[in-house]
């Protein structure tokens, strides 16, 4: 079985409250289904340093202003439509959001926990987690943030062999050592 990461954005999938536009996602998900791929859905309310994008009807909420019920409802609609989705990530490059805003970690932990519980009631087999950029975590010593936000069913990592200036200077041997640090974090 193959696997695909699919990025769906709330402002595209539900541009009007309660009205879903499946035109783009049906094509992407249909191709994955046709090729027997399972899907990890990135429905990120956190994208690195930014929140969203959110639909206009939601506006630009702060982290504690995100309506959990609306998020659960939208995710439920997506998961009910696409049974090939077996894992969901609602925060990508999560470490970047909290690098200078650690005081909001408890707010996000509560939001995540409530959304997790709401999704698990209807979709108990779907795995739910957060994603981190390993190279950022290592280059900026953000392991503590990963440890605090290692909640849900899994922790996902992306990786680029870059230094703190975002230049590719790491040898394959150093990159392998970096990747092995996933098991230490």
Feature-to-residue mapping (PLM):
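Catalytic domains of carbohydrate-active enzymes, especially glycoside hydrolases
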Residues: 1-12, 31, 38-44, 155
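Active-site cleft segment of glycoside hydrolase catalytic domains centered on the general acid/base Glu
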Residues: 22-26, 51-152, 158-181
């Amino acid at each position: 079985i193959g696997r695909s990461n699919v990025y769906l954005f709330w402002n595209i999938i539900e541009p009007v409250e309660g009205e879903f536009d499946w035109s783009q996602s049906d094509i992407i998900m249909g191709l994955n289904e046709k090729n027997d791929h399972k899907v990890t859905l990135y429905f990120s309310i956190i994208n690195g340093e930014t929140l969203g994008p959110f639909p206009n009807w939601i506006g630009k909420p702060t982290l504690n202003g995100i309506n959990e019920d609306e998020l659960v409802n939208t995710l439920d609609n997506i998961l009910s439509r696409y049974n090939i989705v077996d894992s969901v990530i609602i925060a990508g490059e999560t470490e970047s959001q909290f690098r200078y805003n650690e005081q909001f970690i408890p707010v996000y932990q509560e939001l995540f926990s409530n959304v997790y519980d709401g999704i698990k009631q209807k979709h108990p087999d779907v795995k739910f987690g957060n994603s981190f950029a390993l190279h950022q975590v290592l280059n900026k010593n953000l392991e503590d943030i990963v440890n605090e936000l290692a909640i849900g069913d899994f922790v996902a990592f992306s990786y680029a062999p870059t230094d703190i200036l975002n230049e590719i200077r790491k040898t394959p041997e150093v990159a392998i050592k970096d990747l092995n640090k996933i098991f230490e974090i």
